[in-house]
Amino acid sequence: MIRGIGTDIVEIERIKKAIKSNPNFINRFFTQKEIEYFKLRKFNANTISGNFAAKEAVSKALGSGFRGFGLKDIEVLRDELGKPIVNLSDKLYKMFNLDNYNIFISISHSNTDAIAYAIIEVI
């Protein structure tokens, strides 16, 4: 059963400016594993923007936006084929009673924008 869907679009230039103007931007909003992935991608703004949009999309699919939790509670990584995967913090498991669920996420970008779409399925 589908529990929720969410989508988000981010201007890549806005993320570039945030990274330049705030040296703590990446550490504030992304987990250590995400930052390690960004290092492999040479801190590409498209990649960072895509992850940011994915976190927003998942929060919308949860139905709450970011109320009672933060961006680091949603971790967006890649599997061995490069497919984005989502890990949620224990806090979110408890907040939303997510015992048996799947999160499907799609991330794409153009030269100017990154977009993500999330579906949460309860099994």
Curated annotation (Swiss-Prot):
GO BP term (any one): fatty acid biosynthetic process
Keyword vocabulary terms for this entry: Cytoplasm, Fatty acid biosynthesis, Fatty acid metabolism, Lipid biosynthesis, Lipid metabolism, Magnesium, Metal-binding, Transferase
GO molecular function: holo-[acyl-carrier-protein] synthase activity; magnesium ion binding
Cofactor requirement: Mg(2+)
Catalyzed reactions per annotation: apo-[ACP] + CoA = holo-[ACP] + adenosine 3',5'-bisphosphate + H(+)
Subcellular location: Cytoplasm
Binding site for Mg(2+): 8, 56
One Pfam family named in its UniProt record: ACPS
Primary site of residence: cytoplasm
Enzyme class: transferase
Top-level taxon in the UniProt lineage: Bacteria
Keyword Transport set for record: no
One Gene Ontology term, aspect cellular component: cytoplasm
UniProt xrefs under Gene3D superfamilies: 4'-phosphopantetheinyl transferase domain
Record EC number: 2.7.8.7
Protein family membership: Belongs to the P-Pant transferase superfamily. AcpS family.
Function, in words: Transfers the 4'-phosphopantetheine moiety from coenzyme A to a Ser of acyl-carrier-protein.
Protein name: Holo-[acyl-carrier-protein] synthase
Lineage: Bacteria, Bacillati, Bacillota, Clostridia, Eubacteriales
